[in-house]
């Protein structure tokens, strides 16, 4: 019977997180109503489950939820998380504070970690960060490969004077595509803009936090600069995948594989 509660909490979490990820990807925002519905449903299911089947877990439930809330708040106020990301982890803590091993056994035994038994949301968090890092590694490798194949510098003109930090962010989150393709793909955002200065008519600058607001204006400025042959046809762009997508993938990975970081540690330490 307890397995029905766990299955319900997993299903509810996946439904809300998949919707939130889709909404964040398409509109760059998630309605608060998602969390307003998700949180109480998750809390009620968890409380009822532990009251009926495992009363001794209630104090540890409070510990898991409290610790996850603290981490989510710290990440939000330090700028590491957006509001939706923090709320997602809080809701996950209410729904899935402990390992779902009773319902989903990880594919390999190494996926079962001590952390998952007490702080399952932190396993989802570490999986999410690892998957996001792997995505950044792939994009960086792609850019290096393009640099070698085409014998072109990463940054040209005034972009050369941008800081190393900005260049690194662009290299691990974006790639160069033709302006026409950028116009056609609504979900891809420009990572550079044109700035009018006294000394130069068209100075290129990197945009490391692309936003939906002003996207069309940036594209117009870039198009005019390309038409005047001030810059070439390829501009730095990013799909700007929201962290919520990685959180959702991290949850699915935790259900199927368990704690990926623990698996890697176990593998390298033998």
What do these predicted regions represent?
Residues 1-270:
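A membrane-topology feature that recognizes alpha-helical transmembrane segments
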């Amino acid at each position: 019977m307890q397995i029905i509660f766990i299955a319900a909490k997993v299903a509810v979490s996946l439904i809300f997180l998949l919707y939130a990820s889709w909404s964040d990807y398409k509109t760059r925002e998630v309605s608060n109503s998602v969390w307003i519905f998700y949180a109480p449903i998750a809390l009620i299911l968890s409380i009822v489950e532990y009251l009926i089947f495992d009363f001794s877990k209630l104090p540890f439930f409070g510990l898991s939820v409290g610790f996850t809330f603290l981490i989510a708040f710290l990440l939000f106020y330090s700028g590491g998380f957006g509001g939706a990301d923090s709320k997602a982890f809080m809701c996950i803590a209410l729904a899935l504070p402990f390992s779902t091993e009773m319902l989903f056994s990880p594919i390999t035994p190494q996926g079962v970690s001590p952390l998952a038994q007490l702080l399952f949301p932190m396993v989802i968090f570490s999986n999410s960060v690892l998957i996001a890092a792997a995505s950044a590694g792939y994009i960086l490798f792609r850019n290096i490969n393009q640099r070698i194949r085409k014998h072109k510098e990463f940054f040209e003109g005034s972009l050369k004077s941008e800081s190393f930090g900005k260049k690194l962010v662009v290299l691990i989150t974006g790639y160069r595509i033709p302006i026409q393709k950028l116009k056609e793909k609504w979900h891809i955002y420009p990572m550079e803009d044109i700035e009018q200065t006294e000394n130069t008519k068209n100075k290129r600058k990197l945009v490391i936090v692309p936003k939906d607001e002003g996207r069309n204006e940036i594209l117009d400025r870039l198009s005019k600069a390309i038409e005047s042959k001030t810059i070439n046809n390829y501009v730095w762009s990013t799909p700007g995948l929201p962290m919520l997508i990685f959180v959702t993938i991290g949850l699915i990975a935790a259900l199927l594989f368990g704690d990926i970081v623990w698996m890697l540690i176990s593998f390298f330490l033998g």
